[in-house]
């Protein structure tokens, strides 16, 4: 009876079924032509329009963010102690809330980790990002609230895609897989009421399950703590996938990609993943690695897009492929303030909100976020290149510098000097660190650079001379101290064995994840350890 009834109904509605079939065929055909990316791109259009306010109303956006943060903070112990309920303006906020380092918030964060609620942010915060820091820093545990997770970190990821698709309308980004290279959890730091891990591990753990359909590697592989094992498994798992985009820290991603080529026997990555089109990178400067990536990926359609994301938040995105500066993200639940670098550490530094910054000046960044960080010194330094919209470049870290003799050498100077020397000599630098030699047996002072080359210069001496010359060009204080070799002698370059820096990190249990090499330091502790290891035969 059922089949008979079905047949009668089929005959009765045959014209409609035929019409529906034609429509379905048309939809499927158009979907094949349009690609999944073309369809998905439409979901990003509203946000692309919202981002126009960054050009027209940037200061207003920041006022809205501050109002939101203070109103939420009223319901916390910190807010009550600092009179949040009586605040009506930025001046009230600046007057009542002190600038904080991690050490000044640590006791409150420790209480939150043990389950106390409404301390720095309303409710209970379960997740904590273990800050990578340097190899000799004590760990920091940065709270990641549900609001911060969604409205800062995940929103940053969405906006990266929105801006990329805006700039590349022919993209096929969603027609393949995303290779996302992350860190791991840190169970040894867990307490009963909280979970600790690298930020990237927290993001993978909490990501929308639908994203896992287009993400590689498998979750259990992505969260492995043994980087060498993780690298090998990622390479094998992703080898035969249609990878269209990769995301991660340039140094660690390079290690994975080299392994992929070793296993595949191919020379270039486009021979493995012909549809690879973009690398979303952040965490460290990309300049020292660009040439290496261009050698591994020779496809003219390959794009590179920088992001500024950290355990504390997601702050910037490169919105123009022809401009290396990044757009400051203004509506994420992050309120920004800035301290002129030369005033960092002074008793009463000048602190300005966004509208008070000057183009070309170096600032240390202070953030207030929906994760409960109130006027928090993040330790990064930036320089604005534009105010319409607000765009900037990262110039270094407040603790990564050499100023042993008044030369005030920062990471931005170092990166420019290395890029110039590499360009002129054809060399490629994979890792480096530098520190002062305060006085040798001949009473001479200089900077000592330990450099691991992925491609050696023809002459290390020529490379050294070019680096020294360029540092004088970009830093007048260094130039003055180098004048006639009176204060500073010409810098020294020591060539590191291949793999030295990774072996150093490995011995400290910090290989992979978000761990970084400290580039510049007034202290010789790191470089002396590395120089001693450099005497060993590592391979």
Each model region followed by its residue ranges:
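Active-site glycine/GP-rich loop and adjacent strand/helix microenvironment
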Residues: 3, 31-85, 92-100, 108-111, ...
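Short, Lys/Arg-enriched N-terminal segments with co-localized hydrophobic residues
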Residues: 19-33
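Active-site diphosphate/adenylate-binding microenvironment
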Residues: 60, 64-128, 139-144, 151, ...
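Conserved helicase ATPase motor motifs in RecA-like P-loop NTPase domains
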Residues: 129-135
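Conserved AMP-binding loop of ANL adenylate-forming enzymes
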Residues: 163-209
